Structure formats: structure tokens, C-alpha cells
A protein has these predicted regions:
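N-terminal alpha/beta PP-like core and its mobile active-site loop of ThDP/TPP-dependent enzymes
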Residues: 1-140
């Protein structure tokens, strides 16, 4: 049975026992939010801003010992995570942040809300991945 990448994303979160997701919707991540809609195993926390979101995930991880998990859209949504990612990383707080991205064929073409978040976070995060296409999901 084929499932969408968004459905696979939700399935992976559940398999990793993520029960709280700090998330702010936007165009390039909207399919992920549709897949999360009605999901009862994952509580989605919707803050007023991505910067608040990432710091809330950091605080959640510090207070519970669990991984703080974030989901935002591309461009400014992703860029707004940088300070919180750096804070968590420098204090060895476990955090995983997912961002949307423009369509693969538009990467590098200065398209609307495109930000090279992989390069931006190289100095402040342990690992960065840009998933292109369905085959890479199967390798993870």
C-alpha cells in the first residue's frame, strides 16, 4: 500500500514515540498538517510565532527529558528557529526540527520563501538533512 510522504512523516513520529509536536503551519508544510489533523496520539502545540515554538520545544525537552520536536514552513518559518536551535544545541538539549521546503526543482532559484536552512544551521546544529524525493525517506 502506498502512503504519502506526509503520512509517512506522521507514522515515523509515532514510531519514535513523539507525543508532543510544536508546530506552526505554512504553505510548504501544509500537507504534513493535513496528515496530523485528527491524530490523537500526537498533541500539536500551536504557538503564536516560530521563535516561541522553538523555545517552548527546548523547555519541554529540558523539563521532561524527551526530545523537543518542531515543525514549521520554509523561509521565514525556518529562519525563525535558528536562535532556539543554537540555544538547545549549545546546552546539549535534544531537539529535532522539521521545516518545509520549496519544491525540489525550485531549490536554488530564489523562489518565494526559499531559505537555505541546511547551511544556515551548520554552525548551530549537529545534523542537517535535505530530503529530496521519496527514495531518501526509505533509507532513513
Amino acid at each position: 500500500m502506498r502512503i504519502s510522504g506526509a503520512e509517512l512523516f506522521v507514522k515515523a513520529l509515532k514510531e519514535e514515540k513523539v507525543d508532543v509536536l510544536f508546530a506552526y503551519p505554512g504553505g510548504q508544510a501544509i500537507d504534513l498538517f493535513h496528515a496530523l489533523y485528527g491524530e490523537t496520539d500526537i498533541k500539536v502545540i500551536l504557538p503564536r510565532h516560530e521563535q516561541g515554538l522553538v523555545h517552548a520545544a527546548d523547555g519541554y525537552a529540558r523539563s521532561t527529558g524527551k526530545v523537543g520536536v518542531c515543525l514549521v514552513t520554509s523561509g521565514p518559518g525556518a529562519a525563525n528557529l535558528v536562535t532556539g536551535i543554537a540555544t538547545a544545541n549549545y546546552d546539549s538539549v535534544p531537539m529535532v526540527c522539521f521545516t518545509g521546503q520549496v519544491p525540489t526543482k525550485l531549490i536554488g532559484n530564489d523562489s518565494f520563501q526559499e531559505v537555505n536552512i541546511v547551511d544556515i544551521t551548520k554552525a548551530s546544529a549537529n545534523t542537517q538533512l535535505l530530503l529530496k524525493g521519496e527514495k531518501i525517506w526509505l533509507k532513513l
